[in-house]
């Protein structure tokens, strides 16, 4: 089912289906369902159109999600890089930002290990 520009699965509960939207996790999805008095265990196609419209309105008005949230996060990171603070420098160098060790580990952030290849001896 297409919902706010995203394909949501029909065979999952409403609470789980809402988590397919970027920026909405399980706690937020539960909060949406409880505040609108919607059964979270119901399937998405089983909901009435008014319920779907109320969920859509709630998300659009109260929660940053999808493109808006992605732009906000990207702008925040760009701002850190522009002001050249410690976190911005770490982002620019593709290193861990939150104080993790880098002598070992941090492979996901640093990328594949590059082993220098020794040059052949000339005779």
Curated annotation (Swiss-Prot):
Gene3D superfamilies: 1.10.8.50, 30s ribosomal protein s13, domain 2. GO terms for biological process: translation. GO terms for molecular function: rRNA binding; structural constituent of ribosome; tRNA binding. Transmembrane segments: none annotated. Keywords: Ribonucleoprotein, Ribosomal protein, RNA-binding, rRNA-binding, tRNA-binding. GO terms for cellular component: cytosol; small ribosomal subunit. Located at the top of the head of the 30S subunit, it contacts several helices of the 16S rRNA. In the 70S ribosome it contacts the 23S rRNA (bridge B1a) and protein L5 of the 50S subunit (bridge B1b), connecting the 2 subunits; these bridges are implicated in subunit movement. Contacts the tRNAs in the A and P-sites. Part of the 30S ribosomal subunit. Forms a loose heterodimer with protein S19. Forms two bridges to the 50S subunit in the 70S ribosome. Belongs to the universal ribosomal protein uS13 family. This is Small ribosomal subunit protein uS13. It comes from Neorickettsia sennetsu (strain ATCC VR-367 / Miyayama) (Ehrlichia sennetsu). The lineage of its organism: Bacteria, Pseudomonadati, Pseudomonadota, Alphaproteobacteria, Rickettsiales.
């Amino acid at each position: 089912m297409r919902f706010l520009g995203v394909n949501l699965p029909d065979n999952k509960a409403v609470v789980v289906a809402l988590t397919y939207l970027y920026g909405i996790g399980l706690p937020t999805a539960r909060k949406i369902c409880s505040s609108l008095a919607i059964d979270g265990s119901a399937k998405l196609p089983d909901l009435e159109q008014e319920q779907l419209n109320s969920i859509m309105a709630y998300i659009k008005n109260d929660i940053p999600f999808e493109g808006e949230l992605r732009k906000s996060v990207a702008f925040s990171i760009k701002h850190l890089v522009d002001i050249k603070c410690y976190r911005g420098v770490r982002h620019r160098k593709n290193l861990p930002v939150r104080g993790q060790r880098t002598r070992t580990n941090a492979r996901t952030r640093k990328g594949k290990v590059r082993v220098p290849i020794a040059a052949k001896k000339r005779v």
